[in-house]
């Protein structure tokens, strides 16, 4: 029930910004370590476009963003060399992503987005009332 509520809030929020989210067409939960490694390896000026394309591929078209071919296609569409997408599958890159995730977890961050308001942490998709409560506490 909690996951369903989060999905519904995300879909409604997306609609409000003209961004359709199609959780109903997502058939797999891909391994996202290579996608995270690709974002980390991308030049700063290309990261935002890359992240947008990754999100669109997964949340709007249900693509497997853990697949080498799909990731290479997204990389080139974002202005990156396809070879960089292959580097994202390097075990050392995966280890670096996992280390960053472990560090984040140790800091108490459990989801994205993550907000800390007045000592209170809000993780993942939240009802607007959760923000009001945190801001007025």
Language model features with spans:
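Structural alpha/beta surface segment adjacent to cysteine/selenocysteine redox centers
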Residues: 1-61
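C-terminal cap of thioredoxin/glutaredoxin-like
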Residues: 44-137
């Amino acid at each position: 029930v909690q996951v369903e509520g989060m999905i519904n809030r995300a879909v409604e929020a997306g609609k409000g910004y003209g961004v359709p989210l199609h959780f109903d067409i997502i058939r797999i939960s891909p391994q996202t370590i290579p996608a995270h490694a690709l974002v980390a390896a991308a030049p700063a000026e290309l990261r935002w476009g890359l992240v947008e394309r990754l999100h669109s591929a997964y949340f709007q078209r249900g693509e497997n963003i853990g697949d080498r071919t799909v990731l290479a296609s997204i990389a080139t569409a974002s202005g990156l060399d396809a070879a960089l997408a292959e580097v994202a599958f390097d075990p050392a890159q995966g280890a670096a992503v996992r280390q960053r995730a472990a560090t984040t977890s140790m800091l108490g961050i459990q989801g994205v987005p993550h907000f800390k308001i007045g000592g209170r942490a809000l993780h993942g998709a939240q009802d607007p009332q959760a923000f009001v409560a945190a801001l007025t506490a």
